[in-house]
């Protein structure tokens, strides 16, 4: 007879508002740093929501489709004060982004040893953004530059965009059981950005070996790429006027190689060890400068960039986890790593994320309370030990 078909629907949504204000020191005699005589304000609004639909053709085939929307808004500004407490603006930022997302995935189980997943994602991106900062220009340079202390300098627009574009991606991946102990996962992923007609094709594969009932080994390799934040594509420089100098930037690309060892110590405890290496190329950098988008920390980018940067991450992750039993659980994880990048000047630097080590400990205890043991009292503790932030020493002689 006919197999029963089933549909599952799911809805979700979330939002947040974040506001920040920093006031200046009103007594000029107490000014020691540039920040003492500046004021700033930032307001961020974010919202996301969607609906998912899963249709089961039969027990071996299903189609999941999701429609979602996201919205983000950032309004920021900052002013600098002189000793007469007269203010001069040195940043004005307005940014609004709306994404409409359609994604669909078809899963098919051909046999106990062969499954396939095929899907696509279409993202329509609507943007309206404007960044203005005080600039001066040098006759010997094609690039606008900011110059402290920003007083008596008019705001100039360095990034402005209003329109829409699309990011389209598709993939196909399969899982094949080569034997009772060996499993191969392989696939291909591709994406296309209509803003500048840039595209990428990325193969990915992984091999898993069940060495013993308690021990597994795995090796994975893949190529991954990403577009930049939208404001990067709409930076302008002195000689180009209103023309965007970064609009033809290519994707940043990375090759990932990872080994994995997993060991089941007991029914409630697992150990996992994962060494990895990541090589990045086509990273946007500023020519003849140490600047790279890998180190981006500001709300904005103000320079012309080229895809000539590189990056390298190497490290090992170790995790020991005890699942909840008799009300007790804990997890200890540690990472040792080195993260570096090569700027537009050809020199290798530490990234701002290169803390070299991070150790996390999490432990929790639960008690069942009440007449029918339906209430839960829990105590949880998390500890983190990590390396410090990277910084550039001040050149006192300069």
Feature-to-residue mapping (PLM):
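Surface-exposed extracellular loop regions of Gram-negative outer-membrane beta-barrel proteins
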Residues: 18, 22-26, 62-91, 162-194, 214-257, ...
């Amino acid at each position: 007879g006919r197999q029963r078909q089933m549909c599952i629907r799911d809805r979700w949504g979330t939002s947040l508002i974040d506001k920040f204000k920093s006031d200046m020191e009103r007594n000029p005699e107490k000014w020691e740093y540039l920040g003492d005589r500046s004021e700033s304000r930032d307001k961020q609004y974010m919202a996301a929501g969607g609906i998912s639909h899963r249709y089961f053709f039969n027990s071996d085939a299903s189609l999941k489709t999701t429609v979602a929307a996201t919205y983000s808004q950032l309004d920021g500004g900052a002013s600098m004060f002189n000793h007469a407490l007269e203010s001069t603006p040195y940043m004005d930022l307005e940014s609004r982004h709306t994404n409409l997302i359609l994604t669909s995935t078809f899963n098919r189980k051909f046999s106990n040893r062969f499954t396939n997943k095929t899907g696509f994602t279409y993202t329509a991106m609507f943007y309206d953004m404007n960044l203005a900062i005080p600039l001066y220009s040098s006759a010997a340079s094609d690039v606008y530059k900011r110059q402290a202390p920003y007083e008596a300098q008019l705001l100039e627009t360095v990034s402005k965009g209003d329109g829409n574009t699309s990011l389209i991606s598709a993939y196909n991946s399969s899982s094949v059981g080569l034997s009772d102990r060996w499993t191969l996962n392989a696939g291909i992923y591709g994406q296309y950005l209509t803003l500048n007609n840039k595209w990428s094709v990325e193969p990915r594969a992984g091999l898993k070996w069940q060495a013993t009932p308690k021990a597994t080994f795995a090796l994975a390799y893949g190529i991954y790429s990403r577009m930049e934040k939208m404001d990067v594509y709409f930076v302008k420089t002195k000689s180009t006027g209103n023309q965007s100098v970064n609009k033809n930037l290519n994707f940043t690309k990375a090759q990932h190689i990872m080994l994995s060892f997993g060991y089941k110590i007991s029914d409630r405890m697992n150990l996992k060890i994962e060494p990895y290496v990541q090589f990045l190329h086509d990273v946007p950098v500023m020519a003849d400068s140490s600047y790279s988008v890998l180190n981006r920390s500001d709300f904005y980018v103000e320079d012309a960039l080229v895809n000539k940067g590189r990056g390298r991450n190497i490290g090992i992750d170790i995790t020991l986890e005890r699942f909840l039993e008799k009300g007790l659980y804990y997890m200890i994880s540690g990472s040792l790593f080195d993260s570096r990048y090569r700027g537009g000047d050809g020199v290798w630097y530490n990234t701002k994320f290169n803390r070299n080590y991070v150790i996390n400990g999490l432990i929790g205890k639960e008690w069942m309370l009440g007449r029918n043991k339906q209430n839960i009292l829990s105590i949880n503790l998390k500890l983190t030990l990590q390396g410090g932030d990277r910084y550039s020493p001040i050149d006192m002689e300069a």
